[in-house]
Amino acid sequence: MSTLTRLLFLLAIFAGAIASAQWKKTPLQAPAQPNPQLYREDANAGADINRALVAAARQHKRVLLDFGGNWCIDCHVLDNAFHQPRIAPLLNDNFVLVHVNVGQYDKNLDIAKRYKANLEKGVPSLAVLSARGEVLYSTEDFERARVLSEEDVIAFLDKWKPPAPAASPAKK
């Protein structure tokens, strides 16, 4: 067998292994009993966000805004993922989560606009804020949460969690 043939053979095996690993990702699941008040009708989103910013500053976290509605299956799928054993600690240790109710796209649209949440593709839509309220990232990548995996959510949270505090110099 020529060197080129061996190389192509090894590349084919490697590509197959990667494809197999990708195929095994398990899609997120809807909860058995969706929370009918996940996005509270009576919530004051502006006040909730302000409280989250104060808590985030005090706890050295970021704020994760989750724009959605109680009618939205993908919103419940994503929230269910947030409670899974591999995801919950990552979320809770690094973010203050605020659910922002957009109703039937008729509530809190000013807040969605302020935080650059693009609702045109659907919900859930997420925005990551610094503890000072700066929009670090805004995405509509979760509007089809049912096709995402736990690994996708973990990768997103890992990417946007706050940086580890700088190590203080050793005292002499």
Predicted regions and their residues:
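Short active-site neighborhood of thiol/selenol oxidoreductases, capturing the structured segment around
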Residues: Q59-C72
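Structural alpha/beta surface segment adjacent to cysteine/selenocysteine redox centers
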Residues: D106-V123
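Bacterial N-terminal signal peptides
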Residues: L8-A17
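Conserved redox-active cysteine motifs that mediate thiol-disulfide chemistry
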Residues: G69-F82
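Non-catalytic, surface beta->alpha helical segment in thiol-disulfide oxidoreductase systems
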Residues: K121-P165
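Thiol-based oxidoreductase modules, predominantly thioredoxin-like and allied folds used
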Residues: N80, I87-L109
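N-terminal leader/targeting and pre-domain segments
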Residues: W23-Q59
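Bacterial N-terminal signal peptides that target proteins for export
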Residues: M1-L8
